[in-house]
Swiss-Prot record:
Induction: By heat shock (shift from 30 to 45 degrees Celsius) (at protein level). It holds the Pfam family Gly-zipper_YMGG. It comes from Escherichia coli (strain K12). HAMAP family: UPF0757. Belongs to the UPF0757 family. This is UPF0757 protein YmgG. It comes from the Bacteria.
């Protein structure tokens, strides 16, 4: 419990500090917010990493301008590939949904970097 409180405090301090906030883009803010949510779910480091990845993907998709457009294109392709991969692994609908989320997140982040 003490580790969770300490980690949440550190994430909050980084997220809320004024100089850091001024220079962050939506992808970074999403990653920090997702990491905080992942921490609060109680899944430890695994939850923090998954939350940060999904938060970064959502942040990348909501970016304005060319970066956001590229991220949205990447998310579409990544989600489609992930869903097909999830079905082909034999996990049915659940695998397709998980694959689409993971693929869409990765595609959005990579698309933004394009």
């Amino acid at each position: 419990m003490k580790k969770k409180i300490l980690a949440f405090g550190l994430i909050s301090a980084l997220f809320c500090s004024t100089p850091a906030m001024a220079d962050m883009n939506r992808t970074t803010k999403g990653a920090l917010l997702g990491a905080g949510v992942g921490l609060l779910t109680g899944n430890g480091v695994n939850g923090v990493l998954k939350g940060a990845a999904v938060g970064a993907g959502v942040g990348a998709v909501t970016e304005k301008g060319r970066d956001g457009k590229n991220a949205r294109k990447g998310a579409k392709v990544g989600a489609a590939v992930g869903a097909v991969t999830g079905v082909l692994t034999g996990n049915g609908l659940e695998g397709a949904i998980k694959g689409a989320v993971i693929g869409g997140t990765g595609g959005a982040i990579l698309g933004k970097m394009k």
